[in-house]
Amino acid sequence: MVSRVLALISVAMLVGARPYVQNVGDVDLNDVDATVGTGVVDTGMSGDLLAGLLANGLLADLLSEDADGHIPEVTGSSTEEATSSSTWSGASSKPTDSAPTQCNSGTLQCCESTTEAKDIDRVLLSTLLGVDVGSITGLIGKNCSPVSVVGVGAGSTCSTQTVCCDGDSFDGLINLGCKSGNVAV
């Protein structure tokens, strides 16, 4: 459970999401020894994967300072060095005037931002999600929620990025297989 949650958090950070996480299962990310000024978070990930995430800055947002300015140490299940030098280069997409209002396929989603699938480290994303992402094309949405086009009120409008997603969804944190132009006419 903890590994799955940390993997989802890491993937969210891979696409630029900033999830607020205080406690993941039995791992309190803010558990800091006040006398020594250090804490240890054992993710249970392999050293290679963990080092790769750290080298790419993908866990930086999880390691926030406590009131005394201390940052917990993060450890994996080994101390191997990462050999991957890939970085995340996707930028947030800006809303457009041609946002879809209905989808030919998939579901209409309101996403905080999107990134081109071709711009991500597929090996890392596949490892973190536990699915084959080799054939994913189009956009990857982050922090998405369904949009209802019928009626008014909450959920009927989107002030950020509206897309149609027909791929896997990981609790709305990450949506695969999204398109911005998949509109029914």
Curated annotation (Swiss-Prot):
It is found in: Secreted; Secreted, Cell wall. Residues 1-17 form the signal peptide. One of its GO terms (molecular function) is structural constituent of cell wall. Keywords: Cell wall, Disulfide bond, Secreted, Signal. Disulfide bonds join C103-C164, C110-C158, C111-C144, C165-C178. The keyword Disulfide bond applies. The keyword Lipid metabolism does not apply. One of its GO terms (cellular component) is fungal-type cell wall. Residues 75-93 have a biased composition (Low complexity). Residues 94-104 have a biased composition (Polar residues). Residues 70-104 are annotated as: Disordered. Its main location: secreted. It comes from the Eukaryota. InterPro entries: Hydrophobin, Hydrophobin_CS. Self-assembles to form functional amyloid fibrils called rodlets. Self-assembly into fibrillar rodlets occurs spontaneously at hydrophobic:hydrophilic interfaces and the rodlets further associate laterally to form amphipathic monolayers. Belongs to the fungal hydrophobin family. Aerial growth, conidiation, and dispersal of filamentous fungi in the environment rely upon a capability of their secreting small amphipathic proteins called hydrophobins (HPBs) with low sequence identity. Class I can self-assemble into an outermost layer of rodlet bundles on aerial cell surfaces, conferring cellular hydrophobicity that supports fungal growth, development and dispersal; whereas Class II form highly ordered films at water-air interfaces through intermolecular interactions but contribute nothing to the rodlet structure. This is Class I hydrophobin SC6. It comes from Schizophyllum commune.
